[in-house]
A protein has these predicted regions:
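Conserved catalytic/acceptor-binding region of the Class I
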Residues: 137-201
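A short acidic, Gly/Pro-enriched loop at the edge of an enzyme's catalytic core
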Residues: 95-106
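A short glycine-rich, Lys/Arg-flanked "PGG" loop and its adjoining helix->strand segment in the class I
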Residues: 120-135
Length: 259
């Protein structure tokens, strides 16, 4: 799995403030429909950007709890959200949440469940924390939707094969509705959010993935450093001549808990 250390946190911080990932975050926010006075869980809260937005939305009568297993991420989140009195951060994973039963009106997770070995446990524990009739929004990338041009397709495939080892489930969205319904809950909607980049935006998803993929492939001895660097450099070269192209879709599953 990818290690969310201080350097990774810094890379994510830049991209998460960019327009593309801000729109992605907004799509999950809109699907959740936070309302004044609600208690909301932000599961896998990362650096706290969505947590802060939720805290503003629920107001002083509401409360938001951000949960993440990474100390570096929660440190960044606490710093970002230090002015908010209606939120807190707790250490924990999606399949063992430090939350009381049926204590939250709503819960959201953005690109979290795909990294969990125990997907069934994560779904069960998240649903446990939400009140009957509450809403759960789960947003994950489908890595099968990835389109990424390269003039060296074999090298690109090596990098993608390496990257495919950093998550547990790259196809979770196609299975998630059935898993939800099997538990007696209702799927209100599945909303696609496609991110397309033909310029190699400095603050986009593609450039963030390029840095992380190069780092991950070399650190895990999946490819030689020179190969990873050549792949990285090619994408910049393609962008300079107008040939860069990247696209991937995230799916937002909106769940209504039974009861």
């Amino acid at each position: 799995l990818l290690k969310f250390d201080a350097e990774t946190t810094r890379l994510l911080e830049i991209a998460y403030q960019g327009a593309e990932l801000t729109r992605r975050r907004q799509a999950s926010f809109d699907a959740l429909c936070p309302a004044p006075g609600e208690t909301i869980l932000d599961i896998g809260c990362g650096n706290g950007m969505l947590t802060a937005e939720l805290a503003r939305a629920v107001g002083s009568d509401g409360y938001v709890i951000g949960i993440d297993p990474s100390e570096d991420m929660t440190a960044a989140a606490r710093e970002r959200c230090s002015d908010y009195a209606n939120l807190e951060f707790r250490a924990g994973a999606a399949n063992s949440l430090p939350i009381e039963d049926e204590s939250a009106d709503k819960a959201v997770s953005v690109q979290v469940i795909e990294y969990i070995d125990d997907i069934d446990g994560a779904l069960d524990d998240t649903l446990r924390c939400v009140k009957p009739g509450g809403r759960l929004v789960i947003s994950d990338l489908h890595f099968g939707s990835l389109i990424w041009f390269s003039g060296e397709p074999d090298r690109m495939q090596k990098m993608l094969t390496s990257w495919n080892q950093h998550f547990v489930s790259g196809s979770l969205p196609e299975r998630l509705p059935a898993l939800i319904k099997a538990r007696g809950n209702f799927v209100e909607d599945v909303l696609p959010f496609t991110m397309t980049d033909y310029q190699l935006k400095p603050d986009g998803l593609a450039i963030m993935m390029m840095h992380l993929m190069k780092q991950y492939a070399v650190a895990n001895d999946h490819v030689e450093p020179a190969v990873a660097q050549s792949w990285f450099d090619e994408q910049h070269s393609l962008a300079k001549v107008g040939r860069f192209f990247f696209s991937m879709t995230q799916f937002i599953v909106v769940v209504h808990k039974k009861g």
